[in-house]
Amino acid sequence: MIFSMLRKLPKVTCRDVLPEIRAICIEEIGCWMQSYSTSFLTDSYLKYIGWTLHDKHREVRVKCVKALKGLYGNRDLTARLELFTGRFKDWMVSMIVDREYSVAVEAVRLLILILKNMEGVLMDVDCESVYPIV
């Protein structure tokens, strides 16, 4: 019963009208994915993180990128992120020019983790877009 409730919770809270609630939800989903990867590191939960990469509020995007940093920073989990990375890599790369400085900085840090822990995912073109910024 608890797992059933937890399965529905992100769907409701990730679409909440309050950005604070969306930010908390994404932060916690990231924690769940790291702690209980067999249950929560799945496409059905990763999609919420992917959707919030586009959120209009800075704090939600920052929490989203930080949650992804926690996942990409763990080599044991990166193999399970291949499909997600394929779908959202271009968006993650484009976030380095986000209008909010804090989001752009976290996006660069995320790309560094992807480069270190997932060989061959970032192409030269992706890396070249980061060079002028750093």
UniProtKB/Swiss-Prot annotation:
Pfam families with a match to the protein in the record: SCD
Boundaries of every SCD domain copy: 10-95
Main location class: nucleus
Keywords assigned by UniProt, alphabetized: Nucleus
Compartments where found: Nucleus
Domain of life per record: Eukaryota
PROSITE patterns attached to this UniProt entry: SCD (PS51425)
Stretches that traverse the bilayer: none
GO cellular component, one term: nucleus
Similarity-based family: Belongs to the SCC3 family.
Annotated protein name in UniProt: Putative STAG3-like protein 2
Source organism of this protein record: Homo sapiens (Human)
